[in-house]
């Protein structure tokens, strides 16, 4: 079935007029001299496969879409027909088929031909000729069986993503701009969430010793040019030293050392009573050494917390105390004046001197004087 279809496709019944006129230019080996043709071999024209099969003609149209139609003559759109099976074999087997000088040097079509020849390698290794294995009615694409496969362009190699580096081990100068911004944001979150106000101020002083911070500031902007390798090293060591885990360890060590010192200092009942009286007057003289040590530690922790108050908080406390004192003084003065008025009214009522007293209201309308009055005359 395939051989009959192959012969029907390559060996039509009627001779073609184009090749019948050019029979003298075909050599014995079957090479076609196409120097008289003014066409350019370019990409195959995608016509209807059934129409091209029925017309028994292999159309190779010329002049690609990049060439203006005004610059191409009518001969450029002529078709080359292969009417003999031997000629078709010779065309396929000839290695020098692309060496035909179809156009004179310097013409527009020669430039297009050179550009196409660099894109399409017309060697036998690139041709993949396939014969249809079934009838056309079965849906096989004749065009895909005849047109040689175009070599696909090589895919661009995908760029490998940079691995995420450990920024805690890199110096400041070895980081890129994006890594510096990312690390600054990481430090800001870590310091603001895990450390207190004093530690934050210390880190700001390390980064920018000339920074001026007011009590009303709620944020501090870190400039990238302020940091260096040495400053970043100091900040890392400070954060490592004052991390919450290290701070809890130090506080537990201080509490244990203070408790051992207080228990060793208290030796008798007299010493315990004196320490208790120094801490609070409400404690009894006969309290044990453990009670006195706990009271003294509580008092010291309270004074330590008071000393850690910020200046703004202490100022607010002083203002509230001052306002409460002024309010008490005003209430005391008002109460004193009310008592004095009540006492005076009682005296007047007991004396009886003001029983016939009448209160008159006088209203005086002042008239506008035309001129000034000299009171000295």
Curated annotation (Swiss-Prot):
This is Protein FAM199X-A. It comes from Xenopus laevis (African clawed frog). Residues 240-348 are annotated as: Disordered. Residues 319-338 have a biased composition (Basic residues). Transmembrane segments: none annotated. Keywords: Coiled coil. The keyword Coiled coil applies. Residues 321-350 form a coiled coil. Residues 256-301 have a biased composition (Low complexity). Belongs to the FAM199 family. Disulfide bonds: none annotated. Residues 240-254, 339-348 have a biased composition (Basic and acidic residues).
